[in-house]
């Protein structure tokens, strides 16, 4: 399979730079993986597509204000985007500057928010491949508390605008709980408290995994043969409660519905690990890094339906959707979405997809 197989032409004006005023007022494209049928809805209509006894798997990670602006103590401007928090004071980050900082370089961060001369001091410890390990030298305040004061919401590059106060709420799911992500699990942005309450009252079950989405999710695939691509690693937690809920749902003949590709990658990583260890049960608890890469031909052991946003051309996420719904079905659905002026990417519209059980490649 070639990278270009997953290209589609997207007019720039269809990239959503701001969210809709109401979360559940986004549009929803329903795609049948079985026969490729497409229908058009409002996201709140998802209530009618989910049945009593079905299980929704949410990712409860919370986005941290992970982007910081500052300068080297010697004067040069610098931008820091956290990839992963290591300790209360240390983190791995992407760093942009005219010249890469060396070990021992002192940085002053956050003067744009705190005022000149009042920034937070940090030091460059070393490098791990493309990432820099940094340490805040002020140890009396926890890193997450410091980020609340000097950090900016890490909006994706394609949104192409500075973050605003409203993004603190809207680039966050209403059920987010555990801080650590530097990108939102965007399918969940469409759920508001009212819709969640209605689904709960209908008898729909909820379960929560944690995958702290890294900035690597926006890194382009750089190989033509997609099978040569290596995914970045992200930390996943699939606790026993989620395992029990999935097993009970399957036993009852109901559906497991993943809210977002991160939820898919979480539970499918846990299921793959269970299979590789020879467990009889379909899935076992999982607390580890995952670099699972799902593309057409890969099997889904757990997920029956997927709620997801529209993804970038040639991205690993459109490959995952193609593996789930079938390549031709997926590309036809994206063509329909463009023709019908759907909004794309993180602040855009969504899809509700039922699984195609017969995907073997580019079908």
Swiss-Prot record:
Keywords: Cytoplasm, Queuosine biosynthesis, S-adenosyl-L-methionine, Transferase. GO terms for biological process: queuosine biosynthetic process; tRNA wobble guanine modification. Its EC number is 2.4.99.17. InterPro entries: QueA (IPR003699), QueA_dom1 (IPR042118), QueA_dom2 (IPR042119), QueA_sf (IPR036100). Coiled coil: none annotated. It holds the Pfam family Queuosine_synth. Disulfide bonds: none annotated. It is found in: Cytoplasm. The keyword Metal-binding does not apply. One of its GO terms (molecular function) is S-adenosylmethionine:tRNA ribosyltransferase-isomerase activity. Transmembrane segments: none annotated. GO terms for cellular component: cytoplasm. SUPFAM superfamilies: QueA-like. Pathway: tRNA modification; tRNA-queuosine biosynthesis. It catalyses: 7-aminomethyl-7-carbaguanosine(34) in tRNA + S-adenosyl-L-methionine = epoxyqueuosine(34) in tRNA + adenine + L-methionine + 2 H(+). PANTHER family: S-ADENOSYLMETHIONINE:TRNA RIBOSYLTRANSFERASE-ISOMERASE. Monomer. Transfers and isomerizes the ribose moiety from AdoMet to the 7-aminomethyl group of 7-deazaguanine (preQ1-tRNA) to give epoxyqueuosine (oQ-tRNA). HAMAP family: QueA (MF_00113). Belongs to the QueA family. This is S-adenosylmethionine:tRNA ribosyltransferase-isomerase. It comes from Mannheimia succiniciproducens (strain KCTC 0769BP / MBEL55E). The lineage of its organism: Bacteria, Pseudomonadati, Pseudomonadota, Gammaproteobacteria, Pasteurellales.
